Amino acid sequence: MALHLHRAERTDLLADGLGALLADPQPDPFAQELVLVAARGVERWLSQRLSLVLGCGPGRADGVCAGIAFRNPQSLIAEITGTLDDDPWSPEALAWPLLAVIDASLDEPWCRTLASHLGHFATTDAEAELRRGRRYSVARRLAGLFASYARQRPGLLAAWLDGDLGELPGDLAWQPPLWRALVTTVGADPPHVRHDKTIARLRDGPADLPARLSLFGHTRLACTDVQLLDALAVHHDLHLWLPHPSDELWRALAGFQGADGLLPRRQDTSRRAAQHPLLETLGRDVRELQRALPAARATDEFLGATTKPDTLLGWLQADIAGNAPRPAGRSLSDADRSVQVHACHGPARQIDVLREVLLGLLEDDPTLQPRDIVVMCPDIDTYAPLIVAGFGLGEVAGDCHPAHRLRVRLADRALTQTNPLLSVAAELLTIAETRATASQLLNLAQAAPVRAKFGFADDDLDTITTWVRESNIRWGFDPTHRRRYGLDTVVHNTWRLGLDRILTGVAMSEDSQAWLDTALPLDDVGSNRVELAGRLAEFVERLHHVVGGLSGARPLVAWLDALATGIDLLTACNDGWQRAQVQREFADVLARAGSRAAPLLRLPDVRALLDAQLAGRPTRANFRTGTLTVCTMVPMRSVPHRVVCLVGLDDGVFPRLSHPDGDDVLAREPMTGERDIRSEDRQLLLDAIGAATQTLVITYTGADERTGQPRPPAVPLAELLDALDQTTSAPVRERILVTHPLQPFDRKNVTPGALLGAKPFTFDPAALAAAQAAAGKRCPPTAFISGRLPAPPAADVTLADLLDFFKDPVKGFFRALDYTLPWDVDTVEDSIPVQVDALAEWTVGERMLRDMLRGLHPDDAAHSEWRRGTLPPGRLGVRRAKEIRNRARDLAAAALAHRDGHGQAHDVDVDLGDGRRLSGTVTPVFGGRTVSVTYSKLAPKHVLPAWIGLVTLAAQEPGREWSALCIGRSKTRNHIARRLFVPPPDPVAVLRELVLLYDAGRREPLPLPLKTSCAWAQARRDGQDPYPPARECWQTNRFRPGDDDAPAHVRAWGPRAPFEVLLGKPRAGEEVAGEETRLGALAARLWLPLLAAEGSV
């Protein structure tokens, strides 16, 4: 028996060689063949490939692959070492005894460094609790390090047991005594002893394995793995099927074969033998594997070179195989698109570009099928939602992008992405460890299983979000829940207080000024929402109960029971597999812990444990199902496909970021053959290049999707572009690198030859329509409307409509059209307010003022705000409440001094002439005076409604003495502004003028912004130049917004419109003596009668 080494540039050649080997049957017809594969995707592909050569019918191509057991190398190693069912030295199992050893050793002098890290000497309880929460994660990390030492440098652990520390750095001197204590605690043979015994046993006699074994597709093996395989080959035929990109490089490195694999990596000179730049920069793993393989081999054969196509990709592969660039005589054809690199604006555009490229390839080659294409991305969880949205919606998308008719299969996704119950479990742990913010609970309520449990519909969730925002819920279930943050005396902004407000709002209104304990009823909780309020309260109460159970220190089984109970209390699902998977994953965690799961764990420990359990893992069923396969870089990187697509090769993402573990002894002086994930990712790229038989497509983020700032490609991708420049006689980078525009409807995407090939790049009919529209005749920007709308019928006018219009005349125009303007969305806040900005102060002050005008005592009004939770907590909130209360109190006192008794409502019905009337109600009126008051600084928008009401009353009862008083804050701090108006000489004429402006304002946006027009009219009245004050009110500056910033004005005249848009000539009938601009004429008609009627208070 012996070791047989078979090499080839592509795995399909290796598969054919393996098929030829397996076609020679073993003496025992019932004996199974054993094939060890590196990944699940390779297993699926290899079984399909072998089924075409190992069938039982004529030609052996009947698609049957039987009698072959596919396993991964680790399961074989576990079997021959006797640890298939229970390996006490696996990182998952080792973490538990290591945790116990750490807990028992914290007072040992050698353990002081580790004890300090875990809070054993912390001076405060908070710091100690924080650091103790690291115990499991630290134990699991150290267990992983010890397992890595045992697999990659076993002599290190053997020396530590013998007391030989070698050249161990002083800051890591605590690891040898920790290892010795761990070996004593575990009680089983240490890994290096077990390894030596296994090798001796394998050399003494055959293992209980088939006489013939094959190891297929590996590019890296640890030194212990190589030693086991070498020993196994003594009594078994062991065939190693090794994909290697270059036989020339293999022969050049022949002198390194069988050399000591523990050579320091910095002393390794094998890269000098790599004459091709990609073999030098990407191929370190295969070079180091060649060094590590045993020198004694019965067979060392190269299975022949593949026929390379006469394309850029074929030339690159030929150069790699020949271990040298050979550009002479090569010229890239314009039709050669065998290598494509696409620079895009972010992940979403990468998927847009990918589907256009794939559709182009499928259209150009009718023999190409989706199963011939593989899409690999380093970060599949980022791209998975985008891929789902971009492909495979043909059943529901109708006539849209043809890529929606391509079905895709996603593999290697995290369990939290595929099982919503596990996603809920992860979110529960997050909420339990954090503050239970409003956003967290609302996001949890939107999870499908939670919605099913509590019957939350879309409208229900919108209503709940509104309640949460209006009841000022921020974070924390109740004051007790806030105790760990030192805020247990703050009752405001908790879920408990917010729910009390919602539930009391079912029975009473906020105006009743009746509260339950500290809860002020929340308005707008309608009687038809009583059940929803109850379901929300039940959801929060159950969640509070679950989170309460996910605290403290307890054994692992108690944590998993509490989490399972929480899932049962909060979720409902009809798919039994989801709940079964949860139970299976939890059972797997317990099984790995075994009998050593007794140490008490804290919440961060459990989170670290389950994060690793629920992470992405290789899957078998989603590979090579006939659809378009999307997976990570690992499982399919060496499987030949006609088209290989690499998506997301962004700088900083690929290769994976690797921050050396400061506690890793191997990282201080790495040896050849030891794992380096960045080198591993580089090898993945080299394998993927060799696996593409027809086309290689690569996308990356070449520009920021928000700023457009250029971004470089990943370093390995840049090295590939450099190598491609050396593949032909002239550089080809500019021809194969396509820089895509930001938008999919850019005209470049639909212009033949503008991006790729001679055809339009996009297949999207919507993008084509958009591009055609964008490429149409461009007109200079115009106003919102090109002319006035038809005049509305001369109907009667209600006072309410007139008042609404003059709140903002331009907005009144859009309101008449039922046109919705953009508005700021009120978001849910997660932070307790610690300051009161101007808008919040106005809201609070206006509410206090209204309460005081209704007769509420100022202190009670302040207490109501305290119960609403709108003010900062503690003394800060008390101080701000007093400040706002005092201002509101002074305003209320000033208003009440002029309000005699209860206000009356006066119905009005004024004949405007020409068959039109103005009708409505003016309220409240105190004797012969209207008294309006606002917490705001008195501005034109406040006095104009009072003026309109006064004119209407005077027109209704001209013989009575009427007046209007407006009260507000003055521009000088802490002073009160008062403005008194008396009726004009002809109130009916003023009303007619107001109604004419109202009619005109419904036909077009009038250049009549209130502050700007009032400033113009005041300047005219005072005999001053009106342009400077009006321009100042119109234009926004860095200190305050101007009228040009109002949404209605932006929509009508554009953002930051110049002051001149208001200065056109007056229309016919709008003329006013002395005014040459339309703004001046309209301002005179609106404001001069008001200013002339102003009296002294």
UniProtKB/Swiss-Prot annotation:
InterPro entries: DExx_box_DNA_helicase_dom_sf, P-loop_NTPase, RecC, RecC_C, Restrct_endonuc-II-like. A helicase/nuclease that prepares dsDNA breaks (DSB) for recombinational DNA repair. Binds to DSBs and unwinds DNA via a highly rapid and processive ATP-dependent bidirectional helicase activity. Holoenzyme degrades any linearized DNA that is unable to undergo homologous recombination. In the holoenzyme this subunit recognizes the wild-type Chi sequence, and when added to isolated RecB increases its ATP-dependent helicase processivity. Unlike the case in E.coli, suppresses RecA-dependent homologous recombination, is instead required for single-strand annealing pathway repair of DSB. Keywords: ATP-binding, DNA damage, DNA repair, DNA-binding, Exonuclease, Helicase, Hydrolase, Nuclease, Nucleotide-binding. The keyword Nuclease applies. Heterotrimer of RecB, RecC and RecD. All subunits contribute to DNA-binding. HAMAP family: RecC. Coiled coil: none annotated. GO terms for biological process: double-strand break repair via homologous recombination. This is RecBCD enzyme subunit RecC. GO terms for cellular component: exodeoxyribonuclease V complex. In the RecBCD complex, RecB has a slow 3'-5' helicase, an exonuclease activity and loads RecA onto ssDNA, RecD has a fast 5'-3' helicase activity, while RecC stimulates the ATPase and processivity of the RecB helicase and contributes to recognition of the Chi site. It comes from Mycobacterium tuberculosis (strain CDC 1551 / Oshkosh). SUPFAM superfamilies: P-loop containing nucleoside triphosphate hydrolases, Restriction endonuclease-like. It comes from the Bacteria. One of its GO terms (molecular function) is DNA helicase activity. Belongs to the RecC family. PANTHER family: RECBCD ENZYME SUBUNIT RECC.
